[in-house]
């Protein structure tokens, strides 16, 4: 019986900052490590560690200023890594198009599960009849997958390497697995890349699944760098899903 998987995003790594020796600069106590790194990189460009401009002396004011003038390259220094579960293969295909990220994704060639875990689109999940049809179809595909695996195992019986035999069988049989099959993926990106991803995928024009992912990532990143992501505002759409937009993200 197919099992429903729900989106789960966890932060597993984020940049830390240590003031280098020999630099006479005091980190703003209100700044997070990632935000301190952004400011340090900017001040290193112009040797303004003495904070000559009172309007940008505070970390939050400094970061807002560089965003207003479009100096987004400074946001490429801090990075964040998340581990995502409960995301469909079709959604990961959209995710990996963001080439400034680094990815490590669950392999269907090496990992075999006795159960099928799927992500059900809300439009289907909210309708009992459609949900039943969806899950029964997934079960039929899973049965066909198991039959193919058995047949391929028999076909490859002369292969002495059991690991290779199973891998070859899986890589052939997996072609019939549904796009809704759950995947798991580690994603690392700098803050500029994360902002671009959120700007592109948290809009009302994006698919609801990847939009949910983008909004969840925004919530997580706001905790680590509130000023860097504070320009994004969320709102609720007519279908109850959440979107986010920023006046600084215009290249849709």
Swiss-Prot record:
Identify the residues that bind FAD.
Answer: 97-99, 105, 190-192, 196
Pfam families under this entry? Thy1
List, from the UniProt record, the residues annotated as the active site of this protein. 201
Question: Which ranges carry the ThyX domain?
Answer: 7-235
Enzyme Commission number? 2.1.1.148
Listed under catalytic activity are: dUMP + (6R)-5,10-methylene-5,6,7,8-tetrahydrofolate + NADPH + H(+) = dTMP + (6S)-5,6,7,8-tetrahydrofolate + NADP(+)
Q: Give me the segments passing through the membrane.
A: none
Q: How is the cofactor bound?
A: Binds 4 FAD per tetramer. Each FAD binding site is formed by three monomers.
**According to the UniProt entry, where does the motif ThyX motif sit in this chain?**
97-107
Q: Which UniProt keywords apply?
A: FAD, Flavoprotein, Methyltransferase, NADP, Nucleotide biosynthesis, Transferase
| SUPFAM superfamilies reported for this sequence | Thymidylate synthase-complementing protein Thy1
Question: What cofactor does this one take?
Answer: FAD
Q: Where does dUMP bind?
A: 94-97, 105-109, 174, 201
Instruction: Select a single GO molecular function from the record's annotations and give it.
Output: thymidylate synthase activity
* The protein's role, per its UniProt record: Catalyzes the reductive methylation of 2'-deoxyuridine-5'-monophosphate (dUMP) to 2'-deoxythymidine-5'-monophosphate (dTMP) while utilizing 5,10-methylenetetrahydrofolate (mTHF) as the methyl donor, and NADPH and FADH(2) as the reductant.
Question: What is annotated about its quaternary structure and interactions?
Answer: Homotetramer.
Name this protein carries in UniProt? Flavin-dependent thymidylate synthase
């Amino acid at each position: 019986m197919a099992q429903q998987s729900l989106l789960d995003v966890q932060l597993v790594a984020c940049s830390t900052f240590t003031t280098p020796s020999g630099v006479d600069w005091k980190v703003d106590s209100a700044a997070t490590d990632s935000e301190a790194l952004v400011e340090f990189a900017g001040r290193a460009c112009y040797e303004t560690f003495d904070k000559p401009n009172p309007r940008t002396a505070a970390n939050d004011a400094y970061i807002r200023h560089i965003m207003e003038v479009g100096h987004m390259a400074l946001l490429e220094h801090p990075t964040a890594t998340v581990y995502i579960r409960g995301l469909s293969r079709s959604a990961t295909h959209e995710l990996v198009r963001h080439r400034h990220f680094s990815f490590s994704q669950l392999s269907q060639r090496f990992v075999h599960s006795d159960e099928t875990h799927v992500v059900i689109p809300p439009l289907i999940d909210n309708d009992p009849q459609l949900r039943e049809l969806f899950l029964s179809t997934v079960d039929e595909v899973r049965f066909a997958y198991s039959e193919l695996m058995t047949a391929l195992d028999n076909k490859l019986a002369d292969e002495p390497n059991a690991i290779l035999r199973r891998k070859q069988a899986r890589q052939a049989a997996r072609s019939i697995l549904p796009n809704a099959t759950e995947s798991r993926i580690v994603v690392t990106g700098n803050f500029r890349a994360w902002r671009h991803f959120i700007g592109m995928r948290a809009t009302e024009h994006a698919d609801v699944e990847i939009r949910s992912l983008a909004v969840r990532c925004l919530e997580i990143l706001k905790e680590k760098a509130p000023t860097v992501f504070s320009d994004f505002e969320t709102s609720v759409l007519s279908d109850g899903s959440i979107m986010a937009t920023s006046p600084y993200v215009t290249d849709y």
